[in-house]
A protein has these predicted regions:
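Conserved beta-strand elements of the Class I
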Residues: 7-11
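C-terminal accessory helical subdomains adjacent to catalytic cores in phosphodiester-
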Residues: 1-5, 18-36, 47-60, 67-201
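Short beta-strand/turn micro-motifs composed of small residues
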Residues: 12, 65
Length: 201
């Protein structure tokens, strides 16, 4: 029988998620294992990682989803199909000792909108992730692995530049409320729900 682990598997789509999750050590109580698929935009790879985490006995699997490449066409269709299969679902296999809850958390355009919410709220539509990242440059942010390695932790860096996690959570909540109210499908983050799903210290 598989023994359930207390760790949470968090599946991101790239190195930004990997380094941000690592930077949360000491901020949250949960023991998080970041998982990054080989091909960031592949729904096949994402599903493969979800299935692997289920079989490894994680009782919570959280997927951080960048929406910038899932807005239309086949990418959108494949994502919606995957989301329908796994989002907000419980996988219960008592014979294997498996009891797993899976949830997706979307960021539009990408995780950087969550970083922006550390500082400000916005409903501006960004036409590309690069456009959004450029707005973060005023705070010294760079979307490069060299920067992620040298900034002494993304969360700590964002707060050192005047950002605030509680402010980001409030802004993310407001972004969802205004999205639903206005019928908007852009510039929002579900990371407030992510932090509600894990315990902060």
């Amino acid at each position: 029988m598989t023994k359930l682990k207390r760790t949470i598997a968090v599946i991101g789509e790239g190195i930004t998620e990997k380094y941000y999750l690592k930077s949360l050590q000491g901020i949250i109580k949960a023991d998080i294992k970041p998982i990054i698929p080989n091909h960031a935009t592949s729904m096949f790879d994402l599903e493969k990682q979800i299935k692997k985490a289920i079989e490894e006995g994680y009782n919570n699997i959280f997927c951080l989803i960048d929406m910038d490449n899932k807005k239309q066409g086949r990418n959108r269709d494949n994502y919606l199909k995957l989301k329908k299969s796994y989002h907000d679902k419980r996988i219960y296999r008592p014979k294997k000792g498996l009891d797993t809850y899976i949830r997706f958390f979307e960021n539009e355009r990408c995780l950087e909108i969550w970083f922006y919410f550390y500082f400000k709220i916005t409903t501006k539509e960004y036409l590309s992730s690069d456009e959004l990242c450029k707005e973060l440059e005023v705070y010294g942010y760079k979307k490069t692995e060299d920067f992620f390695k040298s900034c002494q932790g993304l969360h700590r860096f964002l707060e050192s530049q005047g950002g605030n996690l509680d402010f980001a959570i409030k802004n993310a909540e407001d972004s969802i409320k205004s999205k639903d109210r206005d019928g908007r499908d852009y510039t929002y983050s579900e990371m407030a729900d992510f932090f509600k799903s894990i315990e902060r210290k």
